[in-house]
């Protein structure tokens, strides 16, 4: 299995007016509210150095895990490849970042792409770019947390039209539904389950409510066997 970290730096984010107050049109959220200054300060505290990244890679390998990271910008492709990552993750909002996919396809042995917030034609084009690589598609609903009645697990069947390796990125609310969504996805044939992981109480961090702890991770791992 894999251990994944995020590679993102505060200096790479850009100011976009629509995020300062958010944008809602006809009752639908077009842009979330995420002011630049608040986001910059949040990400600055979470930055991981190259030395810390190298330590993460070594700890993963020492424990039989495949180290992986998410690449958010093209400027980081070469540096991540030089750190000896063999596997790379692409976030949902970058499934349609086709220049990024092209560069990743040349640098990494395994590419895992989340497909939330992506139109069907964009998924098809991404698959065309990656067709000569070892790639997987993850079904993902970009709603945090994701209610059980909006999981749309049947989407995995459609994704199998493009690759045999299909999985599910689970952002369900752990306190209410536990591991039910992840287990359902496995039962439906998912080869990959992506979950956020925490060693802190679920309410202590921004993504804590959708993160699993070590006990829940062991339960999920045992179920998958």
Map each language-model feature to its residues.
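Catalytic cores and adjacent flexible loops of soluble metabolic enzymes
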Residues: 1-225
């Amino acid at each position: 299995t894999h251990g994944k970290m995020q590679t993102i730096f505060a200096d790479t984010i850009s100011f976009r007016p629509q995020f300062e107050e958010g944008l809602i049109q006809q009752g639908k959220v077009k842009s979330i509210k995420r002011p630049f200054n608040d986001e910059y300060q949040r990400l600055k505290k979470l930055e991981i150095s190259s030395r810390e990244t190298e330590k993460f890679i070594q700890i993963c390998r020492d424990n039989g895990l495949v180290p992986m990271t998410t690449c958010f910008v093209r400027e980081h492709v070469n540096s991540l490849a030089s750190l000896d990552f063999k596997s790379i993750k692409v976030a949902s909002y970058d499934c349609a970042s086709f220049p990024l996919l092209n560069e990743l396809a040349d640098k990494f042995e395994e590419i895992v792409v989340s497909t939330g917030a992506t139109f069907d034609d964009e998924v098809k084009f991404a698959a065309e770019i990656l067709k000569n690589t070892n790639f997987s598609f993850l079904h993902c609903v970009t709603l945090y947390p994701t209610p059980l009645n909006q999981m749309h697990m049947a989407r995995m069947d459609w994704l199998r039209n493009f690759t045999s390796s299909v999985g599910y990125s689970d952002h369900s609310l752990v306190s209410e539904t536990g591991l039910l969504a992840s287990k359902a996805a496995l039962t439906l044939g998912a080869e990959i389950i992506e979950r956020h992981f925490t060693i802190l109480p679920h309410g202590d961090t921004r993504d804590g409510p959708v993160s699993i702890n070590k006990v829940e991770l062991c339960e999920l791992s045992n179920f998958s066997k």
